[in-house]
A protein has these predicted regions:
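Conserved, helical-rich catalytic subdomain that frames metal- and/or nucleotide-binding sites
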Residues: 89-190, 205-239
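Conserved glycine-rich beta-strand-loop-beta hairpin in the small C-terminal domain of fold type I
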Residues: 198-199
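DPxDG-like acidic metal-binding loop motif
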Residues: 16, 45-71, 87
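N-terminal beta-alpha supersecondary unit
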Residues: 1-44, 230-237
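Phosphate-handling active-site elements
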Residues: 25-36, 60-81, 206-219
Length: 239
């Protein structure tokens, strides 16, 4: 395995290698695979980069070896590798519960753009979980807010966004709290930390709105990397 774009392990310390090794074991294959990973999603950013890499590897090797496994079977195997891996077999959107192994494909009414602001630091999940407190739960947040699925605009969507690990991330990494505050101050609707990672995000309804916000954020003097991305739909994901 070779990797460009990030300094990552290329042995079993990488989810891609572990996923392929596990698939080979279960499928009874002894053939090797030459893997070249072009890393574009920031590492430890709370964006599921490693998990999506593992899922992509399983899909690619399944095709390479003519295994013809179902996506459900690959997702179950992926759950052995990492809790977030099964999600990426039910794209573009899904409701995920339990440890991550229960995945229900769903459809969000909202489609738009998201501005991502990634700090240049590695946020360790174990450290974040160690800083989590029961009081971080928001009793006003439904397990699956129905409005999250039906929100038609970014403003409506923002009213339902919640990250139960956001406070823990800020306690573990105070610089993330500062970044969250800076981005929120320049946004028209607030900002949120993605997962247990180093990325703050803001939803926008159009490419123009996202570009304006990205320009403002790039001018705030931070070393963070600012990107704009578009939400996936079924057609885009299939490609």
């Amino acid at each position: 395995m070779r990797c460009t774009g990030a300094d990552l392990p290329t042995d079993s310390g990488n989810l891609v290698v572990r996923a392929i090794e596990r698939l080979a074991e279960v499928a009874g294959r002894n053939a090797g695979v030459d893997v070249e990973l072009h890393k574009r999603i920031p590492v430890a950013a709370g964006l599921g980069g490693g998990s999506s890499d593992a899922a992509s590897a399983l899909l690619a090797v399944d095709e390479l070896w003519n295994l013809a496994w179902s996506r459900e079977a690959l997702a179950r195997l992926g759950a052995e590798i990492g809790s977030d891996v099964p999600l990426f077999f039910s794209m573009p959107s899904a409701l995920v519960t339990g440890r991550g192994e229960r995945v229900e494909p769903t459809r969000l009414a909202w489609r738009g753009w998201i501005v991502l602001v990634s700090a240049k630091l590695e946020v360790l999940t174990d450290r974040v979980y160690a800083m989590w407190r029961p009081s971080d739960r928001d009793p006003g947040v439904e397990a699956v807010p129905s409005g999250l699925l039906t929100a038609a605009t970014a403003d409506e969507l923002a009213g339902y966004l919640h990250n139960g690990l956001q406070a823990a991330v800020q306690r573990a990494y105070p610089d993330m709290g500062c970044l969250l505050e800076e981005v929120g101050r320049r946004s028209e609707r607030g900002a949120w930390i993605s997962g247990a990672g180093s990325t703050v995000y803001v939803p926008c309804d159009s490419a123009e709105e996202a570009a304006r916000l990205a320009d403002r954020l790039r001018g705030m003097g931070s070393t963070a990397t600012v990107r704009t991305v578009r939400t996936l739909d079924e057609t885009m994901h299939n490609h």
